[in-house]
């Protein structure tokens, strides 16, 4: 179903099968985690509605911190979907800088 790790104050959840309910991530997110990366590379994305639902969940969970999805099938800057994990960390770093500068 999923694999999770914490790296650089980011909870990284890699889905290994398609799910619609991400509420299980609430139990994985801790005070050691400021940001959430949802890795969707191993699942087939078939509709934008599901991605919109994931975005709403992720942004609500992290509050003012960063939420990024990783997928090579559906890249969308508006929803912070990038093709690699490295780019996800880059987005988080840029957003941290913007927050520090009050952008």
Describe the predicted segments one by one.
Residues 2-6, 12-103:
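Amphipathic, Lys/Arg-enriched alpha-helical "gate/interface" segment within cytosolic domains
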């Amino acid at each position: 179903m999923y694999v999770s790790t914490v790296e650089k104050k980011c909870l990284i959840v890699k889905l290994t099968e398609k799910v619609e309910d991400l509420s299980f991530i609430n139990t994985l997110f801790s005070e050691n985690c400021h940001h959430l990366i949802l890795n969707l590379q191993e699942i087939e994305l078939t509709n934008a509605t599901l991605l919109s639902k994931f975005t709403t969940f992720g942004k609500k969970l992290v509050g003012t911190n960063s939420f990024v999805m990783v997928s090579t099938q559906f890249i969308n800057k508006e929803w912070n979907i990038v093709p690699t994990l490295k780019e996800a960390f880059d987005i988080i770093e840029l957003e941290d800088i913007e927050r520090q500068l009050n952008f």
